[in-house]
Swiss-Prot record:
Species: Bacillus cereus (strain AH187)
Localization in the cell: Cytoplasm
Highest taxon above the source species: Bacteria
Metabolic or biological pathway, per its Swiss-Prot or TrEMBL entry: Carbohydrate degradation; 2-deoxy-D-ribose 1-phosphate degradation; D-glyceraldehyde 3-phosphate and acetaldehyde from 2-deoxy-alpha-D-ribose 1-phosphate: step 2/2
InterPro entries in the cross-refs: Aldolase_TIM, DeoC, DeoC/FbaB/LacD_aldolase, DeoC_typeI
Main location: cytoplasm
Family: Belongs to the DeoC/FbaB aldolase family. DeoC type 1 subfamily.
Gene Ontology MF annotations: deoxyribose-phosphate aldolase activity
Active site, UniProt feature: D89 (proton donor/acceptor), K152 (schiff-base intermediate with acetaldehyde), K181 (proton donor/acceptor)
Cellular component GO terms, alphabetical: cytoplasm
Function: Catalyzes a reversible aldol reaction between acetaldehyde and D-glyceraldehyde 3-phosphate to generate 2-deoxy-D-ribose 5-phosphate.
Biological process according to GO: 2-deoxyribose 1-phosphate catabolic process; carbohydrate catabolic process; deoxyribonucleotide catabolic process
Protein name: Deoxyribose-phosphate aldolase
Length: 223
């Protein structure tokens, strides 16, 4: 298994400098990761630097809380695509899900999917650490109904990250034709292998190089 091609090489910390982001981009070229996952302010740079390389440009929408309006998320998506994003990872409206407002949650996802249609993959971050199992299932079902390409465990900025149990539940819920992304706390090759065995088809990690080299040093970030 080519683990590198399952990894979104990620830098989302608020204090990331251009030098930090360029390092991630160069590592993505070298190790041929699936994508770089960066904040929207870096999308144009990443798209320019990765032109001609088989590495997608992934960014985040409504991140990390998911509490911005649907209209804002749709605009962010269009803006990111215009600047060169080919994948977007959006955060659901977690509070609305917990309120039982499934209509709002689905519309939120649907509008991002429509904004990205034919131009970018949409991954839906459900923030598993804040949800009950029943809520995780509902979030996955609403994501599929709204037309998302992937469901994703975590932002890496909340109270917990991916677990093999959550990945298995998400995979069981969405079936074989929708992607499942494990992110948050995946720091070693052993972690990554566990997630893939549980049903993950993509891994979000900042410790991507350590994972590929099977090297635990440098693997300290939450993402």
């Amino acid at each position: 298994m080519n683990i590198a091609k399952l990894i979104d090489h990620t830098i989302l910390k608020a204090n990331a400098t251009k030098e930090d982001v360029m390092k991630v981009i160069e590592e993505a070229k070298e190790y041929k990761f699936a994508s770089v996952c960066i904040n929207p302010t870096w999308v144009k740079l990443a798209a320019e630097e990765l032109a001609g390389h088989d590495v997608d440009v992934c960014t985040v929408i409504g991140f990390p809380l998911g509490a911005s309006t649907t209209e804002t998320k749709a605009f962010e998506t269009k803006d990111a695509i215009a600047k060169g994003a080919t994948e977007v990872d959006m955060v659901i409206n977690v509070g609305a899900l917990k309120d039982g407002d499934d209509e709002l949650v689905e519309k939120d996802i649907y509008e991002v999917v429509q904004a990205a249609k034919g131009k970018a993959l949409v991954k839906v971050i459900i923030e598993t650490c804040l949800l009950t199992d029943e809520e995780k299932v509902r979030a996955c079902e609403l994501s599929v109904k709204a037309g998302a390409d992937f469901v994703k465990t975590s932002t890496g900025f909340s109270t917990g990250g991916a677990t093999a149990e959550d990945i298995a539940l998400m995979r069981k819920t969405v079936g074989p034709n929708v992607g499942v992304k494990a992110s948050g706390g995946v720091r070693t090759r052993e972690d990554a292998d566990k997630m893939v065995a549980a049903g993950a088809s993509r891994i979000g990690a900042s410790a991507s190089v350590a994972i590929v080299l099977n090297d635990a040093k440098d693997a300290t970030d939450n993402y």
